[in-house]
Each structure stands twice: as C-alpha cells, then as structure tokens.
Amino acid sequence: MGSSERSEAFGTPRESDMSSGDEAELEELRREAAMLREQLEHAVGSHGGARSARDVHQLEARIDSLAARNSKLMETLKEARQQLLALREEVDRLGQPPSGYGVLLATHEDDTVDVFTSGRKMRLTCSPNIDVSLLRKGQTVRLNEALTVVEAGTFESVGEISTLRELLADGHRALVVGHADEERIVWLAEPLVADNLPDGHPDALNDDTRPRKLRPGDSLLVDTKAGYAFERIPKAEVEDLVLEEVPDVSYEDIGGLTRQIEQIRDAVELPFLHKELYREYALRPPKGVLLYGPPGCGKTLIAKAVANSLAKKMAEVRGDDAREAKSYFLNIKGPELLNKFVGETERHIRLIFQRAREKASEGTPVIVFFDEMDSIFRTRGTGVSSDVETTVVPQLLSEIDGVEGLENVIVIGASNREDMIDPAILRPGRLDVKIKIERPDAEAAQDIFSKYLTEELPLHADDLAEFGGDRTACIKAMIEKVVERMYAEIDDNRFLEVTYANGDKEVMYFKDFNSGAMIQNVVDRAKKNAIKSVLETGQPGLRIQHLLDSIVDEFAENEDLPNTTNPDDWARISGKKGERIVYIRTLVTGKSSSASRAIDTESNLGQYL
C-alpha cells in the first residue's frame, strides 16, 4: 500500500490535536516508522516475498504495536484537553461577581421593571433572555453586577406573619395588622390577586383551581420592607375547626334513644323542612339544643345523626339526589377553643360562626356542635385560677343573639355537667330545647345490643343447634340473656351503698351506671374472646358464654373507677332529689382483694365524672 495509506493505517495524529510538549516523541515515532517502511521495501525488493515472509511478519507486528501506542496517546491528549477546558470553566465561574436578588414591583412597556432591592426601589433593565410579559408582581428576580434582571424566580416563602384586616377596593392592596398591632398597607402578590378576582375576569382562576377567597382574620405571609403579601398561611388551631361534610351516622345506628331522637327531630328538622308553616303560625324556630346526661350515652352520635338526616330531608324537599345531600357539621370540642392568650378564644368563636354563616348563606343547613360545653362556657364567677368565662360566655351569647342572625344555623351543645354551664346560655331564646340523654334501661339495652350483635356475625355451632339453626332466634336469645345478667339485682352486680342525710341507705348496682359505650365494650370483649377461642380450639363462632364473661370483666374493670359525682348528681340518679348524700361505700370485691371501702364524698367525688 502507498505511504499515505500506511500513514492513515498507523493512525498518525494531526498537528491540531497535539500539544507542543509531545511533538518530539511523535517525531521519533514517525522516523522509526519510516525506517521500518524502508527496511520492508528493501527486503521485499531484494529477496522476494517468499524469502522475507518472516521478516515481513515481524515488521507488520511492529507497525501494529506503534499504531496502538499512537492511538492511546491520542486518547490521553483528548482527555487532558477536556480537563483543561473544565478547569477553565470552573475558574471563570469562581471569578464571577456575586448576584443580588430583589422583589418585582411593576413592569413597563419599554421592557424595564421596578425592583425593590437592598432597601430601595430601582428601575432596571432586563436581559434579552427574559420575557418581561411573563414576570409577575411580587416575584423574586436575580440581578447581575450591573443590576440587570437576568433570571426570574419564585415567590418568597419566608417572612413575617400579619393578620388581614380588610381588602381595599382595588383588589390589589390590603390592610394588614402586624406585630404590636402595627397597621400597614401592602400589595397582594399576583397569586393572591387571582384568587380574589370576580368570576369572569380574564385573570381570574376557575372554580377547580381557585382556593378560597381571602377573609378578614386570615394570616398572610408578608415582606414588610418590599410591602408585599405573598400567600395565605393556614393557622393550625383555626384549621382544626373547619367544616366537616355530612357525617355517616343515621338514626338507625342509635339504639335505646327513640324518645330523645323524636324530640330533637321536632326541634331541628321541622323548622328547616316546613319554614312556611312556621312563618304562617309566627313560630320562631329554636336557636339551639342542649343534650345533657351521663357520658357515653350517645350525645355526640345524636348530633351527627341530626346533620345526616337533615341533609337527606333537605335534598328530598329540593328534589335532589339523597346520595349527594349536603349539610355541614362543625364539631367543636370545648378544650380546643381554650387559649392562654387573651382574646384568642373569643376570636376562634367568632371565626366558627363566621364560617357557619358563610356556608348557611348558600341555603345549606349548618350544625355547630359544642362538645364538652361545660369546659368553656362555665358559670361566670366560678373560675378558680382563671376568669376566661367572663368574656367567652358573652362572646357566644352575642353570636347567638347577634344582629346578623343565624339563618340555617343551629347550635347543639353537649355536656355531662349541665349544672356548670352559665344559666344565660340555657335561657329561652338561646339553647331553647333541653333534652336529657338518660342511661339505658333493660329495654333500651336490648335495642343497643341489637346494633352490635347482628345476624352476619359467625355463631358457634352448639349455640345455633339449640335453636335449630335459626340465627335470628339465637341472636335474640343471646341479647335477652346478656341483658338479664347485666340488669339483675344480684349480689355479684352490687356496686355502691349510698347513705343519705336522713339515715336512709340505698344499694346501687352496675346497671345504674350502664351506658351505650359500656355495652359496646362488652360486645367487643366478647368478639375478642371468640377470636381467641378459634385460635386455641379451632372452633369458630360467638357464644353466649363469651358475652357473660365479658360482663364480668367489664364490671371488674370499673371496680376501681367508680363513676361517682357530687351529691346532687347521686340524688338525681337515685330519684331522691331532696336528700343529701353524706356517705358512699363500695360493695364490689372483684379483682381487688381488699374489702369494701368508703369514699369521702366531701373531697373525692368531682374528679370521677
């Protein structure tokens, strides 16, 4: 082959790919390759192909070795060049001057922008790479050393928290209150402006992407130096009070409270469903309902069932699908409202009713349910270490009696110490209807048991065989037997002996302290015993003995926790309201090995409720 072809085969590098330091070595390789070519040509020309085959083979091997060395050297040189370029870029980057940041205030038609940076407002030019039309007010922008906008960032995510007092008429500014009640006017960043623009405005968000509009009292993230509010910050203690959708509890899920359910339906549902009749008879619907009675007897369940039933009835009246019925149930636990800071509890109450009115203005029923009402709306003047009730109670009264009114809003309170609630809340015109949720008697207990012991449960084969395989009869017999055991006035069921001021004594049994929650506990214990029995014996199914054992365990567990209250409550339970209780003695000797013990009614009663 020709010399040029052989040069290409040898892979001789071009001058442009080499550095001056390696030229000597490459030149030496070229001379050596040229000498080898001459020797090869001389050998072929002088002795012929057959005679010099061995020499030709050696020369070709030598040429291949040189070509490989040349290729490796080229790769090394390329790698070194790339490293040099990377180092040069790093040096250039480290040598760049620092960038500054600012908040965009406004844009102009000549592609200049107003930016707040370093504590001053400046008009700056933009880099050609920046599309000024895409910039948004309140956005963070990056500036080079010449104070030219070179990059658009996001909106600020840290800053001070201020409270929105009101939105100004232009919709782009707001009055906020900061630390130490300092008022200031700030601009709203474009996301907040778009949230609050009216429907139909070209920049307004659609209903799917629009968050709720700003309201007085909202917390805003504010940059006080730039004068911008960037986003609404939800407060945890306020967001815990958000409106809950329709509860999934119906009246059919509640047992043993038929009379009380009828009372509350008359008080709540009739005014909503038959407004015309109420107007015709000039009858004012009640503003509120108080559910009171011992704990664990279904007060909260009834309130949730009211919201569920009301939503479905309203949907029927309007001709809507009952499955899409809507009402709102605002569940407020009294202790959640308490706050150590002066005025915070009252602010929470105002927010609760403000949100309730907003939802009710759409024609949707709203139920505001205060659980543990006695914990916050106590009788004024009874506080030992705090007088918070002196301002909280008037705040609730002003919301109920306020000039704004409570259209489509019903207030339901629940308490097991109704005697501690301020009387002003309970007078007619406020919580008009008062319904006592009593402890279940034997008939009510059977109804409650039937909600938990259903025919779908697996029953033991032996128990089923006694009733010829009739599951309904077996379940009914189970319920009757367990209720009979629970309500029997036998020695095993004795709990307390009460002594009255006139010397009379009365024995109280566990049935006097029974509740729906206790019945549910009994059934749950029995189901757990049935599961353990399956694991131990392999025989599936619930037995009557599981239920009877659960009653014994439940009574024994309550032995050390007698649900004692003040003497007036004891008199209310026993039916002797005119007699004062002076002495209480426990009669149970279950899991505790000690004998009957006395309870000092003067000091150890109130904390058990």
UniProtKB/Swiss-Prot annotation:
SMART domains: AAA (SM00382)
Binding site for ATP: G296, C297, G298, K299, T300, L301
Signal peptide stretch: none
GO molecular function ontology, one term from the record: ATP binding
Gene3D superfamilies listed in its UniProt record: 1.10.8.60, 1.20.5.170, Nucleic acid-binding proteins, P-loop containing nucleotide triphosphate hydrolases
Entry GO terms, CC: proteasome complex
Keyword check for Chaperone: yes
Any one biological process term the GO annotation gives: proteasomal protein catabolic process
Regions annotated as coiled coil: 17-96
Chain residue ranges for the region called Disordered: 1-27
Keyword Transferase included in the entry's annotation: no
Swiss-Prot/TrEMBL keywords: ATP-binding, Chaperone, Coiled coil, Nucleotide-binding, Proteasome
The protein's annotated pathway: Protein degradation; proteasomal Pup-dependent pathway
InterPro entries in UniProt: AAA+_ATPase, AAA_ATPase_domain, ATPase_AAA_core, ATPase_AAA_CS, NA-bd_OB-fold, P-loop_NTPase, Prot_ATP_ID_OB_2nd, Prot_ATP_ID_OB_N
Region Docks into pockets in the proteasome alpha-ring: start-end pairs: 608-609
Annotated domain remarks: Consists of three main regions, an N-terminal coiled-coil domain that binds to protein Pup and functions as a docking station, an interdomain involved in ARC hexamerization, and a C-terminal ATPase domain of the AAA type.
Record function comment: ATPase which is responsible for recognizing, binding, unfolding and translocation of pupylated proteins into the bacterial 20S proteasome core particle. May be essential for opening the gate of the 20S proteasome via an interaction with its C-terminus, thereby allowing substrate entry and access to the site of proteolysis. Thus, the C-termini of the proteasomal ATPase may function like a 'key in a lock' to induce gate opening and therefore regulate proteolysis.
Family: Belongs to the AAA ATPase family.
Assembly and binders: Homohexamer. Assembles into a hexameric ring structure that caps the 20S proteasome core. Strongly interacts with the prokaryotic ubiquitin-like protein Pup through a hydrophobic interface; the interacting region of ARC lies in its N-terminal coiled-coil domain. There is one Pup binding site per ARC hexamer ring. Upon ATP-binding, the C-terminus of ARC interacts with the alpha-rings of the proteasome core, possibly by binding to the intersubunit pockets.
PANTHER family cross-referenced by the UniProt entry: AAA-FAMILY ATPASE, PROTEASOME-ASSOCIATED ATPASE
Protein name: Proteasome-associated ATPase
Protein source organism: Mycobacterium avium (strain 104)
Gene expressing this chain: mpa
